[in-house]
Design a protein with these regions (language model features):
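Conserved donor NDP-sugar-binding/catalytic core segment of glycosyltransferases
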Residues: 99-130
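Conserved nucleotide-sugar donor-binding catalytic segment
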Residues: 80, 132-217, 221
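Short, well-formed alpha-helical segments that are part of the catalytic scaffolds
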Residues: 13-27
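Acidic helix N-cap motif at the loop->helix transition within catalytic regions
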Residues: 16-19, 44-52, 95, 99
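Short aromatic/hydrophobic "clamp" motif used to bind/position activated sugar donors
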Residues: 87
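A conserved acidic beta->alpha catalytic loop
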Residues: 31, 39-48, 67, 91
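Cell-envelope/extracellular polymer assembly enzymes that use nucleotide-activated donors
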Residues: 3-6, 24, 34, 178
Length: 255
């Protein structure tokens, strides 16, 4: 029998996208999953839409927060409820290809791995394909990941029996990158499924679309997560920016 995959989905005011996101999970060829949605006190119809799905599909589970506490809290809340052998992440506005989970679980088992991710394609806020494919080094070393988050959150899967549930402080930004750093520091290198298995949605109001916020949050990874002093963190950020501007674009291609 196939092992259970727990899909972690934090939500907040995503009524425009959540229906398609849930449907992309329901369309998976790998069917042994639970989708754990932790809502961070949405003020729109997000909760009502999720409840509509949950009433018809017992694999979809909703947990509601009474107050808005941030994406990190919602993600941790969902993770605490997870019961699967594997943990997968998906944001409430992104989409999976139908064979995403099946290909990744098979890849993990065939190669005796405990963590993997994949390439992904990009769409705009309205769902139009931007013909922009994001790839990564293969294999991906800890040093490469240290200077650039090559792992798309919507593509990552790890073995919770091996690593345990990786729960980080909710106040920390770039929580996803910190999780991958924690994992790859332990296993030394990571291997992606070398094909796109998801659509990443680029929204006008997303954190990922704000370069200034990203620089600030990425600096926090070196300063707070790794614990480096101010001067060394600045030097690391210079190397990080070099990687972002010069090296990473080589892995962004037309789809």
């Amino acid at each position: 029998m196939s092992e259970l995959v727990s899909i972690i989905v934090p939500t907040y005011n995503t009524e425009k996208f959540i229906r398609l996101t849930i449907e992309s999970v329901q369309n998976q060829t790998y069917t042994n999953w639970e989708m754990i949605l932790a809502d961070d006190a949405s003020t729109d119809k997000t909760v009502a839409i999720i409840e509509e799905f949950a009433q018809k599909d017992s694999r979809i589970k909703l947990f509601k927060s009474l107050e808005n506490r941030g994406n990190g809290f919602a993600r941790n809340n969902a993770l605490e409820k997870a019961t699967g052998k594997y943990i997968a992440y998906l944001d409430a506005d992104d989409l999976w290809f139908p064979e995403k989970l099946e290909k990744q679980i098979e890849f993990l088992k065939t190669n005796n791995l405990h963590f993997t991710f994949s390439f992904y394609d990009s769409i705009d806020e309205e769902g139009n394909n931007l013909n922009r494919r994001v790839e990564s080094p293969n294999p991906l070393t800890y040093k490469e990941l240290f200077f650039c988050n090559y792992v798309g959150n919507l593509t990552a899967v790890y073995d919770a029996d091996y690593f345990g549930k990786i729960i980080l402080e909710t106040t920390q930004k770039r929580q996803d990158w910190r999780i991958w750093l924690t994992i790859v520091k332990q296993i030394k290198i990571a291997k992606p499924v070398p094909e796109p298995l998801a659509f990443y949605r680029i929204r006008k109001d997303s954190v990922s679309s704000s370069k200034f916020k990203l620089i600030k949050h990425n600096f926090g990874v070196y300063r707070e997560f790794h614990g480096y002093n101010l001067v060394f963190s600045i030097l690391l950020m210079i190397r990080f920016l070099f990687t972002q501007l010069i090296i990473k674009p080589k892995y962004i291609k037309k789809s």
